[in-house]
Amino acid sequence: MPARILTIAQQKGGAGKTTLAAQLAVTWAKAGRRVGLLDIDPQGSLSAWFALRHARLGDEANLTLVQAAGWRLGTELDRLRAGHDLVLIDSPPHAETEVRIAVRAATLILVPIQPSPMDLWATAPTLEIARREKIPALALLNRAPAKGKLVDRIRADLAASGVTLTTTSLGNRIAFASAMLDGRGVSETQPRGSAASELTRLATELEQSLAY
């Protein structure tokens, strides 16, 4: 069965796409899924994280990464799709051609949003591409405080715009950055911590959405 493809996209830089891709990939790989990562962001942060991980852990049966752009993108995506259960695409913030290809290939699009007006406003172009391509999309509140008026306002504004939010949100936790610095996931560095618990719930929720 071809892989289900999760494209992580957001027009605004610094929304946490790369961290999200890496952390979800580790969580799913540890659960026995064959996970492929496709890094199409010219910045190459996901590839740098993976190189650090590979240097420390060596080859892993359930986790691979390919970096591609331009004409190679479709070919590499087909290869990953054929050999994995799940493929995660880390997309660039502003390269419209690559983003469109990643969106069209997706089973589901995940749009991370930090609780700020700028992130909220930046979601519109990505969601519009998803609507035009008729690909389901979910928004995720990322680096969010546990509660507060701003978070409530952003939730309300997203709902009023017809945007579907994931039930799970991710807190603003240093554990994510610490794990990335080690080339690992929070499910490995702090498996009983709050960050790992949030990631596990999010991974379960997304996998259910990807199944349809």
Explain the meaning of each model-derived region.
Residues 120-136, 142:
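Conserved C-terminal guanine-recognition region of P-loop GTPase G domains, centered on the G4
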Residues 186-212:
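NTP-binding/hydrolysis catalytic cores, primarily Walker-type P-loop NTPases
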Residues 96-117:
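Inter-motif core of Ras-like GTPase G domains
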Residues 145, 155-185:
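Beta-strand-loop-alpha "switch" segments that mediate conformational coupling across diverse proteins
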Residues 37, 89, 111, 139-141:
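Structural beta-sheet core signal
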Residues 2-15, 23-100, 128, 179-188:
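P-loop/Walker-type NTP enzyme "switch/lid" segment
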Residues 20:
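Hydrophobic positions on the alpha1 helix immediately C-terminal to the Walker A/P-loop
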